[in-house]
Amino acid sequence: MKLLLKYFPDLTEEQRKQFAALYELYIDWNSKINVISRKDIENLYEHHVLHSLGIARIIRFRAGSSVMDLGTGGGFPGIPLAILFPDTKFHLVDSIGKKVRVATEVANAIGLKNVTFRHARAEEEKQTFDFVVSRAVMPLADLIKIIRKNISPKQQNALPNGLICLKGGELEHEAMPFKHKTSMHNLNEDFDEEFFQTKKVVYVTI
């Protein structure tokens, strides 16, 4: 939790309680259903929660916005973002039912009211949203092809509607076909920890 407060000092008391509760909840659920590698669970706040919140370094979702988290796994980046933006609606989708169950149980346990869940493949989701977020789900070209149908034409945020991905490593080749619509933000500009040296937020206007 100290790590989160280092970078997000203005969290409300409710948000602090919700973030603080995540550790024990994920420890418990991860012992039953593996959604985070066993060796990485100790790094929950750095590698998963803070990483998810990297998206907030490029956008502050406005009240009433809608966001789909595609391939949410155990709830990342959707659950941390839903805590940070309580007036934004988040829809978390994953093709693996047991992972959706973990995310649902965690969200219910901390009292999140602005999240919905669906066990489905990306191709099956027909609703539209202001943004789609994801964390290293698949190559950019494949992801854009799948989610183009899910981006609403109605604009209400400072950034035009589109796709926001958390990715790592060398991405120039992957982003090349979309270079005129893509911007990359290096998270090592915001977060000091070694983990973020190669981590990026990739934004693509759709």
UniProtKB/Swiss-Prot annotation:
Q: List positions binding S-adenosyl-L-methionine.
A: 71, 76, 122-123, 135
Q: Which InterPro entries match?
A: rRNA_ssu_MeTfrase_G (IPR003682), SAM-dependent_MTases_sf (IPR029063)
Q: Which Gene Ontology cellular-component terms appear in the entry?
A: cytosol
Looking at its record, which EC class is this enzyme? transferase
Give yes or no: UniProt keyword Methyltransferase: yes
Q: What is its EC number?
A: 2.1.1.-
The main location class comes to: cytoplasm
Which family is annotated? Answer: Belongs to the methyltransferase superfamily. RNA methyltransferase RsmG family.
Question: By its UniProt entry, which HAMAP family does this protein fall under?
Answer: 16SrRNA_methyltr_G
According to its UniProt entry, the function of this protein is described as: Specifically methylates the N7 position of a guanine in 16S rRNA.
Designated name of the protein: Ribosomal RNA small subunit methyltransferase G
Organism this protein belongs to: Bacteroides fragilis (strain ATCC 25285 / DSM 2151 / CCUG 4856 / JCM 11019 / LMG 10263 / NCTC 9343 / Onslow / VPI 2553 / EN-2)
